[in-house]
Each structure stands twice: as structure tokens, then as C-alpha cells.
A protein has these predicted regions:
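AMP-binding/adenylate-forming catalytic core of the ANL superfamily
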Residues: 277, 285, 296, 428, ...
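Conserved AMP-binding/adenylation subdomain of ANL enzymes
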Residues: 213-230, 240-283, 297-305
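Conserved AMP-binding/adenylate-forming
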Residues: 315-317, 324-463, 471-473
């Protein structure tokens, strides 16, 4: 028989089918003893994880049942590789089925998975390798497992750290001989989560099964998770909001989830809204402020949002992970109200890795509420009669989540009444047991079960208002200045946007403290740069009443944390070390 190869057609590939939103399995709000038990229960239903490409096309459906089977095999491979209970297994946290299986595999093996960041577009090869080396030195893992495409970078970090490194495709080919999986208890450490490092060197936060599941239950109760809910996320799994809020919480609360990779969101942010529009049920989706900002900027003023999007079923549009800016959120409402988006869907929140994730959530349906606070109240100074009053909008971040307490304290630890600004402390079952191998830092922030969050805020009728990071505060002549206020003032000038500006304090040649403002400038014309510098200086003086140092720097110069937030502390250190080089401008 003769076969004509030219006329043969390849067999049609079957497109994956997304896991369903609804399930007959009775919903349990994370009422489990261990994360492994939560996985077992979720695997008995039909929901799961769904991975999409940059255009929002489904490329892999991953039911929780398949995740459990793969995690079991991964646990056996880890045990065969010599991984013992309590060992750390470092995993480069790509948003993928492979990472999910390895994360749970480490948990089932009794080890502590340690999610590590992916490279970012604003950092170079050496800075990424150095970042991995620092975190590998901190967590001291038995293995580092990573995607094959990162073999060169992650492999270099592993070799430099004396850690065995392997890509996960190669690891998946290893034998998985039968073995007994260790039993876990609620107070065993479940995983290590590196804090963002926005205001201090990154720490490995030790999170127990009890702490995790308590926080995940608080998510479900706070957001009133319903049968029609589906989660949509682009958040990175190496950040606590992505890992805990959009990977572990949907599993422990049995919610199907649709994912875009973070780098795909950065290229095509409106694909996020496409996924939400396609969901026929109700949507739960979180983003830092900058995610909403990018989408509002991308939609053209000539474009009718309803021609492409249907956001009428977006039930919870969470806000968190950075300072919530009312002006940005209003711009998002203005851009997408035509597509059915309702401002009451916004759900501001407050949290940090040291509390597993959530400390407070706004009650569902209340949206964004702000209070105008006079600048002198924020700075601790009295208002002069000859000085016009200036106000700052402070966002209400909701009420303490279930089983969490929040207190506002003076510097000496004395509790403060409603309306008084002080340090934010919290206490509850989801507060960390401590930083891994760092007792001094643990003792510095944990006192009698209470966690010093490092943030400043005030309470009002049970609601928490966050005004900024204590360590970011600029104190000049005994007066407090919030860098966010200075940065916001500069952002209002034409040509600048959120993330272009970093404000901090430096010591002037005369020994006095003075504000410094670094501004990313896109203009190549020197005369225009001089004009901008002088305009910025005048704007900052109008806000602070002081002269300041203004330096214009090239775009994409300001350092970021692994989650993409501005790192003012690192910007200051790099500037003082001469590693951030401003444009040379005439005085």
C-alpha cells in the first residue's frame, strides 16, 4: 500500500476543558487540621486550577484530583532524594502545574517548600542570581528546583550556594519508589514565605498549618465565598497575596481558579479582564493598585469598554499588597463602569506575610471609603493659623478578619484610642511563629503573641486605616512627612506616573536631615530636564514647606521588591552608594 505523506493530516488536538465552577461536593471553609487534609478533600471534587496563555486561551486544566496525584509522586521522589521532615525545598515559583505539584509534594513529604521569585524585567542577570543566593543562604535548602528555561540562572545560584539544583522536568523523570509519608500536625511548619523586603532585608517567615488554615478560613468568611464564585488571578506565586490568597486559599476553600502568568499580564493586562468577562458565574479577583492603574491607562478614551468586556459579575475586586490610592481606583471605575463594573465590588484589605496574609478585610459591598485627615495630624505638628490646611485621603482597609485583633500603640507600647495615629499591632492564630533562624528579628517584632507590623495607622469604629510604613517616614525637625504624600504630589505633574518617584531622607553636608526625591525622567532635552527639576522642587516645597534635593534619573532605575513594589530603602542605599547615577544638570 502506498501512503501519500503530502495529503496526510495530523490528528486534531483536543482543547482542554476548564474545571467547573460548581460542584456537588459540600463546601468546607478551610476547616482542616493540615494543608494535606485540605488537598485530599478538594481532590474528591471536580474543581481545580486552569492555566491560560497571554491571550487568555486555556492551555492546561489541572483538577485538584490530578494535583493530589502528582503531589504524591513528587513527595516520593523527594523522599528518595533524601529529603527529610523539616528540610527546606526551594522552588522557583512559576505559575504552573509543576510548581503546584512540587509545593504540595514537599508538604506531603514533611519538608518546608520555599517559593523563590522569578527574574523581573527591571533586574539584570547578576542581580537575580544574587537575590537567589541571599535567599538560599537564609533558608539552607536540601534542593533547589526550577523551570528548565531558568537552568542557567538558577543553576548558577545553586552552585554558588552549594545547593543541589535540578530543573523540574528532569526531577519528574526520577523514580518514585513507594514510601510512607510522614504524618503532619497542625503546629508543624507548613512552608517558608519570604517577606517582600520593602522596608527590611527579606526574612523567611515560618508559617504553620494552623496559621495558614486559620487565615484561609478567614478569607472565605470575609469574602462570603459562594457556589457561583470563581477566582481569576495574575499575581505571582512567590508573593504572599499570590501564593496564599490566589493558590492555597482557592484550594482549601474548593474554588476553581483561572491563571495568567504575571509576565503575561504585564504584556497584555486587559487579558485579565477578558478572563473575568468570560466567567459566567461570579468572580473573585485581587490586584495591587498598580494593576487597576495599568488597565485604566490601557483602555483608550475612544474605546467603549462594553464592546469588549462584561464586568457586571465581578463580585469581589480586591485591593491590597500596596498603598491603595482612591484616585487610581476612581479612574478604573470611570474607565469600566460602561462594562458593568460596580464600585461596590472593591474590597480593600490589609495584610502581611508575618500574619500569613490577611489582617483586615472590608465588609463585602461597602467598597472604597476614605477619610480626609489634616496633614498636621499625620505629621504630629500643630496647625499654624497662617498656613492653609491640607488634607490627605486615607483609605479604610476594613475590619479585622475572623479571630484577629488589631491594636494601635504608642512607640512605648501604650494602646491608643480611636483616631490616634500610631504603630499597628495584631494578634491571632495566623500570626507567624517567627523568622527562620533569626531569633533577634523575631524578638524585635513579636511580643506576648502580638506582632509589630511596622505600619502606622489608626482605628475608627472597628475599621483600620493605614497611613504608611513606620520605617519609610521622613522626620525633619521633629515633623513627620510621609513619602507617599511627596511622591503623590510629583505624580500629579504631567508626564509622571505611580512608580516614577522615590522619596526618602538623607543627611545634608551640614549634618541636618533633608528630603531627597528621585524622579525617573523620560525627557532627553537638558533644558526640559532643568525645568522639570525646578517644577518638582516647587511642588514638593508646597507640600512639605521645605527645600529638598531633587534628582532626575533614567527610566527603569528605581529598585523594586520581588512583588514589583518600590523599595525606598534600597533606592536610598543605592543613591548614597553612587550606584544610582542622576542626570548632570546645571544648578
Amino acid at each position: 500500500m502506498t501512503i501519500d505523506l503530502a495529503t496526510m493530516t495530523a490528528p486534531a488536538t483536543v482543547a482542554p476543558t476548564a474545571t467547573p465552577t460548581e460542584d456537588r461536593l459540600p463546601r468546607r471553609f478551610s476547616d482542616f487540621t493540615t494543608l494535606g487534609e485540605a488537598l485530599d478533600y478538594a481532590a474528591s471534587g471536580v474543581r481545580g486550577l486552569n492555566f491560560h496563555d497571554a491571550r487568555g486561551t486555556l492551555v492546561r486544566s489541572y483538577p485538584f484530583a490530578q494535583l493530589r496525584a502528582d503531589a504524591h509522586d513528587a513527595a516520593l521522589r523527594l523522599i528518595a532524594a533524601g529529603v527529610a521532615p523539616g528540610d527546606r525545598v526551594a522552588l522557583v515559583a512559576e505559575t504552573s502545574a509543576e510548581f503546584g505539584a512540587l509545593f504540595f509534594g514537599a508538604v506531603l513529604a514533611g519538608a518546608w517548600p520555599v517559593p523563590l521569585p522569578l527574574p523581573t524585567s527591571f533586574g539584570g542577570r547578576e542581580s537575580y542570581i544574587d537575590q537567589l543566593r541571599v535567599q538560599l543562604a537564609s533558608c539552607d535548602p536540601t534542593l533547589l528546583i526550577y523551570p528548565a528555561e531558568l537552568a542557567q540562572l538558577a543553576g548558577a545560584a545553586a552552585e554558588a550556594s552549594g545547593v543541589t539544583g535540578v530543573d523540574w522536568a528532569a526531577f519528574a523523570t526520577r523514580p518514585a519508589p513507594a514510601a510512607s509519608l510522614p504524618a503532619a500536625s497542625a503546629d508543624d511548619v507548613c512552608y517558608l514565605q519570604y517577606s517582600s523586603g520593602s522596608t527590611r532585608f527579606p526574612h523567611g517567615v515560618a508559617v504553620t498549618h494552623r496559621a495558614l488554615l486559620s487565615n484561609l478560613a478567614a478569607h472565605a468568611h470575609g469574602m462570603q465565598i459562594a457556589e457561583t464564585d470563581r477566582c481569576i488571578s495574575w499575581l505571582p506565586w512567590y508573593h504572599d497575596m499570590g501564593l496564599v490568597g490566589c493558590f492555597l486559599s482557592p484550594l482549601a476553600n474548593q474554588v476553581s481558579t483561572d491563571y495568567l502568568k504575571t509576565e503575561d499580564f504585564a504584556r497584555r493586562p486587559l487579558s485579565w479582564l477578558d478572563l473575568i468577562s468570560r466567567n459566567k458565574g461570579t468572580s473573585l479577583s485581587y490586584s495591587p493598585t498598580f494593576g487597576y492603574d495599568i488597565c485604566a491607562r490601557r483602555i483608550s478614551s475612544q474605546t467603549k469598554a462594553s464592546d469588549r468586556f462584561d464586568l457586571s459579575r465581578w463580585r469581589v475586586a480586591g485591593n491590597g499588597a500596596d498603598m491603595i490610592r482612591p484616585d487610581v481606583m476612581q479612574a478604573f471605575v470611570d474607565a469600566f463602569a460602561d462594562a458593568g463594573f460596580q464600585a461596590t465590588a472593591f474590597l480593600p484589605s490589609y495584610g502581611l506575610a508575618e500574619a500569613t496574609l490577611a489582617v483586615s478585610l472590608m465588609p463585602v459591598g461597602e467598597g472604597i471609603r476614605v477619610e480626609l485627615v489634616e496633614e498636621t495630624e499625620l505629621s504630629g505638628m500643630h496647625h499654624g493659623e497662617d498656613r492653609p490646611q491640607r488634607y490627605r485621603a486615607i483609605v479604610n482597609c476594613g475590619k479585622a478578619v475572623r479571630d484577629m485583633e488589631i491594636q494601635i500603640r504608642e512607640e512605648d507600647g501604650t494602646p491608643l484610642p480611636d483616631g490616634a495615629i500610631g504603630k499597628v499591632w495584631c494578634r491571632g492564630p495566623s500570626v507567624m511563629v517567627g523568622y527562620f533562624r533569626d531569633q533577634a528579628s523575631t524578638d524585635a517584632c513579636l511580643v506576648d503573641g502580638w506582632l509589630d507590623t511596622g505600619d502606622m495607622g489608626y482605628m475608627s469604629d472597628g475599621y483600620i486605616f493605614i497611613v504608611g510604613r513606620a520605617k519609610d517616614m521622613i522626620i525633619i525637625n521633629g515633623r513627620n512627612h510621609w513619602p507617599q504624600d511627596i511622591e503623590w504630589a510629583v505624580e500629579q505633574l504631567p508626564g509622571f506616573k505611580a512608580g516614577d518617584i522615590a522619596a526618602f531622607a538623607i543627611t545634608a553636608p551640614g549634618g541636618e536631615e533633608t528630603p531627597a526625591v528621585l524622579v525617573q525622567c523620560r525627557s532627553s532635552d537638558e533644558a526640559e530636564r532643568v525645568r522639570l527639576r525646578d517644577e518638582i522642587r516647587d511642588r514638593v516645597r508646597s507640600v512639605t514647606g521645605m527645600n529638598c534635593v531633587v534628582e532626575l534619573i533614567p527610566p527603569r532605575t528605581l529598585p523594586r521588591t520581588s512583588s514589583g513594589k518600590l523599595s525606598r530603602a534600597k533606592a536610598r542605599n543605592l543613591y548614597l552608594a553612587g550606584e544610582i547615577k542622576p542626570y548632570d544638570l546645571a544648578a
